[in-house]
C-alpha cells in the first residue's frame, strides 16, 4: 500500500466554492486536484493500492481530512473538475471526528496533521523536501510507505517539527523544486521500477514465471 498526504494550507473547508474557479474561490484546490489525479491514475486504469489524504486547512473550519481510496473509488475522472466535484460533495456532509463516506471510495472527517500521523502508527513516513536524501538510494528498501508533501506554500516549521517527531525521513525526488503533483509522479515511477525489479507488478502482485 502507498499512502500520500498533501497539505492544503489555503484549501477551503466548506463546499460553497465554484468548480469553475478552483484556484481562487476554493483556495488553490486545483493543486490538490492535480495531486489526486497524479497519485491515482494510470494510462488505462487506476492504482488500487494507493490512498490519497487531503489535509484542508483553509477557512471557514480549518482541519478537515478527505481520503480517496484507490481500491474502492468510483466516479473519478482525470480532470481537475471531477476530483474537485468529489471534494465538494465530501465537504457538504455534516463532518465529525469519525470517517463519513461521501461517495464510493471518498471519506471525510475532522482532523489535523497529528490526527493523520497517529493513523499511520507503525508505518514508514517520508517527508519530501528538496534537500532530502535521494529516493534513488532508498527505493529498493521502501515497503508500505506514507509520503507527506506540502502544497505551493510548502510545509510550515510547526508541521515539519511534527513530522520529524513522528519519525519521518526526509527524502527528495531531485535537486530542484517541483510541483507537488510532479513529485508524486516521480515517486510512483521510482517505486514501480523497484517493484518490477523484485518481480512484482506494481500494486503488490508477483509476476508469474514466464511472464
Swiss-Prot record:
Reaction catalyzed: pseudouridine(54) in tRNA + S-adenosyl-L-methionine = N(1)-methylpseudouridine(54) in tRNA + S-adenosyl-L-homocysteine + H(+)
Superkingdom assignment: Archaea
NCBIfam families, sorted: PRK02135.1
GO BP, sorted A to Z: tRNA methylation
Keyword terms of this UniProt record: Cytoplasm, Methyltransferase, S-adenosyl-L-methionine, Transferase, tRNA processing
Transmembrane segments: none
Quaternary state and interactors: Homodimer.
InterPro entries reported for this sequence: Alpha/beta_knot_MTases, TrmY, tRNA_m1G_MTases_N
Compartments where located: Cytoplasm
EC annotation from Swiss-Prot or TrEMBL: 2.1.1.257
Family from the record: Belongs to the methyltransferase superfamily. TrmY family.
GO molecular function terms noted in the UniProt entry: S-adenosylmethionine-dependent methyltransferase activity; tRNA methyltransferase activity
Protein name listed in UniProt: tRNA (pseudouridine(54)-N(1))-methyltransferase
Binding, S-adenosyl-L-methionine: 128, 150, 183
GO cellular component: cytoplasm
Role this protein plays: Specifically catalyzes the N1-methylation of pseudouridine at position 54 (Psi54) in tRNAs.
Amino acid at each position: 500500500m502507498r499512502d500520500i498526504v498533501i497539505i492544503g494550507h489555503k484549501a477551503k473547508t466548506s463546499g460553497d466554492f465554484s468548480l469553475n474557479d478552483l484556484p481562487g474561490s476554493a483556495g488553490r484546490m486545483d493543486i490538490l486536484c492535480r495531486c489526486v489525479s497524479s497519485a491515482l491514475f494510470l494510462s488505462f486504469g487506476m492504482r488500487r493500492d494507493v490512498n490519497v489524504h487531503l489535509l484542508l486547512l483553509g477557512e471557514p473550519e480549518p482541519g478537515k481530512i478527505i481520503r480517496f481510496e484507490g481500491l474502492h473509488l468510483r466516479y473519478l475522472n482525470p480532470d481537475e473538475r471531477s476530483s474537485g466535484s468529489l471534494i465538494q460533495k465530501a465537504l457538504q456532509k455534516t463532518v465529525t471526528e469519525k470517517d463519513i463516506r461521501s461517495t464510493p471510495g471518498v471519506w471525510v472527517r475532522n482532523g489535523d496533521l497529528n490526527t493523520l500521523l497517529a493513523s499511520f502508527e507503525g508505518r514508514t513516513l517520508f517527508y519530501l523536501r528538496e534537500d532530502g536524501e535521494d529516493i534513488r538510494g532508498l527505493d529498493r528498501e521502501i515497503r508500505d510507505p506514507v509520503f507527506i508533501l506540502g502544497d505551493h506554500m510548502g510545509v510550515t516549521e510547526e508541521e515539519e517539527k511534527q513530522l520529524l517527531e513522528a519519525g519521518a525521513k526526509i527524502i527528495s525526488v531531485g535537486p530542484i523544486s517541483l510541483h507537488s503533483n510532479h513529485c508524486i509522479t516521480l515517486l510512483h515511477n521510482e517505486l514501480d521500477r523497484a517493484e518490477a525489479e523484485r518481480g512484482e507488478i506494481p500494486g503488490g502482485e508477483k509476476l508469474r514465471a514466464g511472464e
